[in-house]
Design a protein with these regions (language model features):
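Intrinsically disordered, low-complexity cationic segments
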Residues: 1-3, 7, 30, 41
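N-terminal Sec-pathway targeting helices
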Residues: 3-18
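Generic alpha-helix initiation/capping and coil-helix boundary signal
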Residues: 15-18, 30, 88, 442
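Core hydrophobic alpha-helical transmembrane segments of single-pass membrane proteins
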Residues: 17-25
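Sequence/structural signature of beta-propeller modules
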Residues: 25-73
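Extracytoplasmic/lumenal domain signature
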Residues: 45-48, 69-89, 97-104, 110-139, ...
């Protein structure tokens, strides 16, 4: 179990270590002063048609922009690079865009606000970097932010912050550490914001040591802890949550995926599981744990669940385990097990390499799923991308790719966006045909892509946000 919960974390460790970011020092200091506090000047709506306010667009995590009308299959081939924004650290968080402002977290420890029209930086706030002696790599901001009620919500290390959208000043901050060695506690993933609360999961740093995984619900206005849920019993470690919580507002449900556990029994509590919880109390409703026949060493769920509708008012969600099997569940009957599943790779502890953990996208009855190391028709590929009927699992199309896909998929107006290896790609949703590609200088696409208002925003581990348009 040496590599537990590392899926997302191991992938980050591998990326940053390869880039030498382990030794990166603070290069930028906020001119605002990170301990200053002020109230937001106004309350922003959840989203207008021109906003992308959450990781994968919304807290349902479908990765689809239903309001895109400019980009389409007829003009995607005409995309060109329009501008870039550089920070002193790698970018593995998805850019969030609200009211024409881009909110981008960087591994240099800063949250940046950038005007999407003028391309000028509006503010930056240094939240810091974290590291422990047992892991060789230090990190800044790894998770994607969320924007709501005039605040930017983001975690760094074991502290969760709310920043004023207009100036970046800290409105509130809350420590969520459970382990007395504070550096062992990390908020890796993106938050969900709903029901007047911010939901965020806690996991360990590099599994050295593991900690007890916890889901927190914080008051959106004050940051006070409203509720919490432990994924494994007291006395155990593991069950960390390093993906984003998914929200079903219609049923008042939070859905999370959890990591594995170290102590005997090897799968205690709700470790290595998908879990549904009440969004007010965080009391567990149901969970399903990977069965012994499908378990691998380090059997984490590293992907964020994708929520989608079904017939008869039913709601389903799909999620990848690091065994490279994609599972789909009936939300109302999770404990009964998946309604369908498909294996798309060899699986393993090394997320993004032989284990799949990219979150899927959903639109109009189709799931778009990217797997890791696989063999198709006798040929080995670093990854694959495919389309599946969301209710039956029927394969619609699938291609093997030479580069690894780390980031979650994005869709908009008939287009599918992915980053494989060092290549940003735009495909036709209907058949997977490649419409546009752009190759970066290095193996550099690890953050999810944002497609909004005719522009495509691609975060890169070469420290730049690349922006494409017609």
């Amino acid at each position: 179990m040496h590599y537990h919960i590392r899926g997302h974390k191991l992938f980050i460790i591998e990326i940053l270590w390869m880039l030498g970011i382990a030794s990166l020092s603070f290069l930028v200091v906020s001119h605002l002063g990170i301990f200053a506090a002020s109230s937001p000047s106004h309350a922003a709506p959840f989203a207008s048609s021109g906003d992308w306010p959450r990781f994968m667009y919304s807290d349902m995590h479908q990765g689809n922009n239903p309001n895109e009308t400019i980009l389409n299959t007829g003009n995607a081939s005409s995309l060109t690079l329009k501008w870039k924004f550089k920070t002193p650290g790698s970018l593995i968080a998805e850019p969030i865009i609200v009211n024409g402002i881009i909110y981008q977290g960087s591994n240099d420890g800063n949250m940046y606000a950038i005007d999407a029209t003028t391309h000028q930086q509006l503010w930056q706030t240094l939240l810091g970097r974290h590291s422990i002696s047992t892991c060789p790599v230090s990190y800044g901001i790894t998770g994607t932010a969320a924007v709501d009620i005039g605040m930017v919500f983001i975690g760094e290390g074991y502290t969760f912050y709310a920043l004023n959208t207009s100036n970046g000043q800290i409105v509130w901050q809350t420590s969520l550490a459970i382990n007395s060695n504070l550096a062992d506690n990390v908020l890796w993933g993106a938050p969900a914001v709903a029901n007047g609360k911010v939901y965020i999961g806690l996991a360990s740093d590099c599994d050295k040591p593991l900690i007890q995984g916890i889901l927190y619900a914080l008051d959106e206005n004050s940051g006070s802890i409203v509720a919490s849920a432990k994924m494994v019993p007291d006395g155990f470690v593991g069950g960390g949550i390093w993906s984003a919580p998914t929200i079903d507002a219609a049923t008042g449900t939070v859905i999370v995926s959890t990591g594995s556990v170290e102590k005997s029994p090897p799968f205690a509590g709700m470790s290595a599981s998908v879990v549904t919880l009440d969004w007010n109390t965080l009391a567990a409703k149901q969970f399903w744990q990977v069965p012994a026949s499908q378990r691998i060493k380090d059997a984490d769920w590293g992907a964020t669940p994708t929520l989608f509708p079904g017939p008869g008012g039913k709601t389903y969600f799909g999620c990848f385990n690091k065994n490279s099997t994609y599972y789909v569940f009936d939300e109302a009957n999770v404990s009964a097990g998946p309604v369908w599943q498909v294996n798309l790779g060899v699986g393993g502890a090394l997320a993004g390499i032989n284990a799949s953990f990219a979150s899927s996208a959903y639109v109009n009855g189709t799931l778009f799923i990217a797997g890791a190391l696989t063999t198709i028709n006798g040929t080995s590929y670093a990854s694959s991308i495919g389309a599946f009927d969301a209710l039956t699992g029927q394969l619609l199309w699938r291609f093997g790719l030479p580069g690894r896909i780390f980031a979650s998929l994005t869709t908009a107006n008939g287009l599918l966006f992915d980053g494989q290896g060092k290549t940003f790609e735009v495909r036709d949703q209907s058949n997977g045909n490649l419409l546009f590609s752009y190759t970066f200088p290095s193996n550099s696409i690890k953050g999810a892509i944002t497609a909004l208002n005719g522009m495509v925003y691609v975060p890169s581990v070469d420290d730049k946000l690349y922006v494409f348009g017609l």
